[in-house]
Swiss-Prot record:
PANTHER family xrefs: UPF0291 PROTEIN CBO2609/CLC_2481 (PTHR37300), UPF0291 PROTEIN YNZC (PTHR37300:SF1)
Keyword tags: Cytoplasm
Disulfide-linked positions: none
Gene3D superfamilies xref list: Helix hairpin bin
Natural source organism: Lactococcus lactis subsp. cremoris (strain SK11)
Protein's name in the database: UPF0291 protein LACR_1198
One GO CC term, this protein: cytoplasm
Domain of life: Bacteria
Length: 80
């Protein structure tokens, strides 16, 4: 799930309101939902970036990508 700028703005708005005057029960639930969606999006983006990394030994020029990562890349069609 990708998070939109509007959702990030709403997260920030709820955080400011919580500090200033507190949140209703519905707003607390909305805040928790939006925060979880934001964290899930960040984790998915990070995982996607890590899964595309290829590690090369500087001295030998050999591919030293960990086997576990190579397997994930094969599964996703990024390796032979």
């Amino acid at each position: 799930m990708t998070i939109t700028n509007e959702q990030v703005e709403r997260i920030n708005e709820l955080a400011r309101k919580k500090k200033a005057e507190g949140l209703s029960e519905a707003e607390l639930e909305e805040q928790a939902f939006l925060r979880r969606a934001y964290l899930d999006s960040v984790k998915a983006n990070f995982r996607s970036q890590v899964e595309t990394i290829k590690v090369i030994d500087e001295k030998t020029g050999e591919d030293v990508t960990p086997d576990k990562l190579k397997e994930i890349q094969r599964k996703n069609g990024m390796r032979d």
